[in-house]
Amino acid sequence: MSLIDWFAARRKDQFVGKVSQDPEESDGLWVKCSECGQVAYRKDLISNFNVCSNCGHHNRINSDERINIIADKDSFKEFDESLSPTDPLKFKDRRSYSERIKESQQGTGLKDGVITGLCSVNSMPLALAVMDFRFMGGSMGSVVGEKITRIVETATIKNYPILIVCASGGARMQEGMLSLMQMAKISGALKKHRAKNLLYMPLLTHPTTGGVTASFAMLGDLILAEPKALIGFAGRRVIEQTLREKLPDNFQTAEYLLEHGFVDVIVNRKELKSTLTKLLKIHGVKELVQTN
């Protein structure tokens, strides 16, 4: 091998070593799109809302990034940030539930899988709940259910519209019935919110499944979804085995649900804030009065 070939091979190895297929990984300057294979400079991807500029694939983002996209700068005020899950059932599979909680808290910096609070969107008030898939797959346990219920109740008292950003594998099995009852609790709070003719919009992101889909994710006045998001209750394989037939390739995607009337609009992440602004104005939401 010549010296030139050696340097070329070395440069190639260094370049490839810095390419990541996971935009959430902190190391590496380059990210390879899992959909089309396009390699993008990480900073360019972030500035494009973590959407692939080549194919439009929406990469998964965390709750803080979601809030920054939706809320006006410095307007978000978090609620119930100290609520943390316990292990009432002393659940253990290969590892204890307590260990899994601790690991997720250390890995994400979150207490549990949702952040809730009040904010403004182009000066219009909004109650906001953002689920974070990094925390045990965004599963819904008692703390997630309690925080969402509380922010819905706050919105009802203040006459605020609500947006819940869904990203979840469903109910948290480690909490058993305590997890499942959150479906009814949140739904009940939303019914009281609706009784005051207030606007509720869920945003279904990839993935939204299980008990979340079977409850508050599908109760919105307007149901929004991100492109190609996986949305469903049971998994594709389970359904195919039960029905004993092949499902369409696009089954359980946002586009499939839009076509069949389960989703009202698919919103590109870059257009989310402007879309929310239009919807809030259409529904008569007034701008907050600024006080000194």
Swiss-Prot record:
Which GO cellular component does the record give, naming just one?
acetyl-CoA carboxylase complex
Give the CoA carboxyltransferase N-terminal domain ranges.
29-292
Which EC numbers does the record give?
Answer: 2.1.3.15
- Enumerate the residues binding Zn(2+): 33, 36, 52, 55
Q: Which UniProt keywords apply?
A: ATP-binding, Cytoplasm, Fatty acid biosynthesis, Fatty acid metabolism, Lipid biosynthesis, Lipid metabolism, Metal-binding, Nucleotide-binding, Transferase, Zinc, Zinc-finger
Q: Which reaction does it catalyse?
A: N(6)-carboxybiotinyl-L-lysyl-[protein] + acetyl-CoA = N(6)-biotinyl-L-lysyl-[protein] + malonyl-CoA
According to the UniProt record, what class of enzyme is this? transferase
Cellular location(s):
Cytoplasm
Which coarse location class describes where this protein primarily resides? cytoplasm
So which residues are the signal peptide here? none
Q: Which domain of life is it from?
A: Bacteria
User: What is its pathway?
Assistant: Lipid metabolism; malonyl-CoA biosynthesis; malonyl-CoA from acetyl-CoA: step 1/1
Looking up InterPro entries in the UniProt record yields: AcCoA_carboxyl_beta, Acetyl_CoA_COase_Trfase_b_su, ClpP/crotonase-like_dom_sf, COA_CT_N, Znf-ACC
> Which GO BP terms apply?
fatty acid biosynthetic process; malonyl-CoA biosynthetic process
The prosthetic group or cofactor this protein requires is: Zn(2+)
Q: Does the keyword Zinc-finger apply?
A: yes
| Gene3D superfamilies (alphabetical) | 2-enoyl-CoA Hydratase, Chain A, domain 1
The record's GO molecular-function terms, alphabetically, read: acetyl-CoA carboxylase activity; ATP binding; carboxyl- or carbamoyltransferase activity; zinc ion binding
Q: List the disulfide bonds.
A: none
**What is the role of the protein in this entry?**
Component of the acetyl coenzyme A carboxylase (ACC) complex. Biotin carboxylase (BC) catalyzes the carboxylation of biotin on its carrier protein (BCCP) and then the CO(2) group is transferred by the transcarboxylase to acetyl-CoA to form malonyl-CoA.
The entry assigns this protein to a family as follows:
Belongs to the AccD/PCCB family.
Assembly = Acetyl-CoA carboxylase is a heterohexamer composed of biotin carboxyl carrier protein (AccB), biotin carboxylase (AccC) and two subunits each of ACCase subunit alpha (AccA) and ACCase subunit beta (AccD).
Listed NCBIfam families: accD
Instruction: List the protein's name.
Output: Acetyl-coenzyme A carboxylase carboxyl transferase subunit beta
Q: What gene, per UniProt, encodes this protein?
A: accD
